Amino acid sequence: MIDTHCHIDDPQYAEGLDAFLAEQRQDGVECILVPGVDKTSVKDVLEVCDRYPEYLFPALGLHPENVKEDWHEQLATIKAAVDARMHQLPTVNSNLIAIGEIGLDYHWDTTFKEQQHEALRKQMRWAEQYNLPVMIHSRDATEDTLNILREFPSVKGVMHCFSGSHEVAKQVIDMGYYLGIGGVLTFKNCKLAEHLVGIPLERLVLETDAPYMAPVPYRGKRNESRWMRHVAERLAEVYNCSVEHIIKTTTANAKALFVIKL
């Protein structure tokens, strides 16, 4: 399994991280992708990934909830880090795996709605510049998000923590994007399983959004990458196939999208 979205730089994981990651590896997690969310997370994401250079892979970006008055400064700091990272001599894990976590979020506040749009466009241009995939966050902003993504047809990526309708899922995959499937699939009364019917398994990747969104039966706890197996088990029911087939296919999908060589 590959966890395509895990905030392992969160302080909740600081204590005992060596043992924690050893447990994930032992239970079938091949590697973990670690997105940034703002300028302060740049240092944390890169440092933790550099400590485990063949297991943790970094992404950098400005999360839409963090687009505030200082968004220009935020983007300038993050872009400088992106440029520096991409111009390093390549090693196993020196370069970025993606631009992310980026997108639009209107759930709590739309004060900076237009600034979110411009921040997303700027970061999509970074992805164009470096031929990197993107990790897209979209909450209560589906139409605007998809419209902006369509402005950049050469950029591909994943719709992180997907929980939308079948129609939206179709639009996303028709654009060449993947759907990031996490713990929400296991939640009671979740309609996502119905919405995935007819969506090719070849367009799905697994993720956690850890430390959040732990799947049943661990809902409410600090999430772990190895618990993606519960998501895979639910997907096996949806696609009427073995758990092993789900894991093999989603792992291959993640490796293809993010150009991961293990």
What are these regions (language model features)?
Residues 1-262:
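Mid-domain alpha/beta scaffold segments of enzyme catalytic cores
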